[in-house]
UniProtKB/Swiss-Prot annotation:
Xref: Pfam families: HSP33 (PF01430)
Purpose: Redox regulated molecular chaperone. Protects both thermally unfolding and oxidatively damaged proteins from irreversible aggregation. Plays an important role in the bacterial defense system toward oxidative stress.
Cell location: Cytoplasm
GO cellular component, one term: cytoplasm
Organismal lineage: Bacteria, Pseudomonadati, Pseudomonadota, Gammaproteobacteria, Pseudomonadales
Protein name listed in UniProt: 33 kDa chaperonin
Regions that span the bilayer: none
Recorded name of the encoding gene: hslO
GO-annotated biological processes: protein refolding
Keyword Transmembrane helix: no
Organism: Pseudomonas syringae pv. syringae (strain B728a)
Length: 300
């Protein structure tokens, strides 16, 4: 097994003689931070890691400033997988599951039967976009690839793997016509890179560095690998956001909540477990227009 840099990163590459680009992602530290917040069973942790890798790949592919959200829902053992990744490459994720229904070695269709996958882009400026596709693939890689078959003119394929310690992803995408103009040659070139990518095993994907993976797959094709782009875990929760949620209740309801909770309202972030506390003084200050800064404790 190769040593990895001490950061998580995505890395783009292109084929010099065909109209195909690619992206690789390696997540270790951010994946560990997400799993440290919630002790997921191994099959759930694997699915969440794959979805984190997918989100990181998509942020490197889709040009926007804002937030990308991948949300998978089902009526099965895992009713929710959710990952958010900002255009600044800050990542967080969460899963909901019924422990009694999660079995060892379970895959996507075992855990999320009849599920759906929503891809949402929430730009800092402009209109929010959402697309939804059925989780009908054998795994998340196939389901996400199916989404792009339905919604994109350019071919896009995903390979995603996670083992509870490391999450890896590979994306291949056709580019507009430039290097190859003949339609049959263009299709053959696309099938060539996909066929080779399909030979990559989970052990290789999780254990090899990017240069070795690309040499293993495409040593006969001229490929250019670009610089790494760091990615990290960061939760976007804050005391201010929690206070805004409290303010939306109105003064009377907020004061009643303080009374019902023995003098202190606790607001927990579902992603990182950060807890924000608001007492009667905080509530009065909030509705008096005094802001949300206070000496009230917060804790993880």
């Amino acid at each position: 097994m190769h040593d990895f840099p001490n950061i998580d990163f995505t890395q783009r590459f292109i084929f010099d003689e065909s109209d195909v680009r690619g992206e690789l992602v390696a997540l270790e530290r951010s994946y560990a931070e997400v799993l440290a917040k919630h002790p997921y069973p191994e099959p759930v942790a694997q699915l969440l890691g794959e979805l984190m890798a997918a989100a990181a790949l998509l942020v490197g592919t889709l040009k926007f400033d804002g937030l990308l959200i991948l949300q998978a829902r089902s009526s099965g053992a895992v009713p929710l997988l959710m990952v958010e990744c900002s255009s600044e490459r800050e990542l967080r994720g969460i899963a909901r599951y019924d422990e009694a229904l999660v079995t060892a070695g379970a895959g996507l269709q075992d855990l999320m039967p009849d599920g759906s996958l929503a891809l949402t882009i929430d730009p800092n400026k402009g209109k929010r976009y959402q697309g939804i596709v059925a989780l009908d693939g054998v795994d998340l890689s196939e389901s996400l690839s199916n989404y792009f078959v339905m919604s994109e003119q350019l071919g896009t394929r995903f390979w995603l793997k996670a083992d509870g310690h490391r999450a890896r992803g590979l994306l291949l995408q056709q580019l507009p016509i430039a290097q190859i103009t003949d339609p049959e040659e263009r299709d053959a070139s696309w099938e060539h890179v996909i066929t080779l990518a399909n030979t990559l095993t989970a052990e290789e994907m999780l254990g090899l560095d990017n240069q070795t993976i690309l040499h293993r797959l495409y040593h006969e094709d001229p490929v250019r690998l670009f610089d790494e782009q760091p990615i990290c875990f960061r939760c976007s929760c804050s005391r201010e956001r929690s206070a805004n949620a409290l303010a939306s209740l109105g003064l009377e309801d907020a004061q009643q909540l303080v009374i019902e909770h023995n003098g202190t309202i606790e607001i927990d972030c579902q992603f990182c477990n950060q807890r924000y506390l608001f007492d009667a003084t905080d509530v009065a200050q909030l509705f008096a227009g005094g802001g949300v800064d206070s000496p009230s404790d917060t804790r993880h």
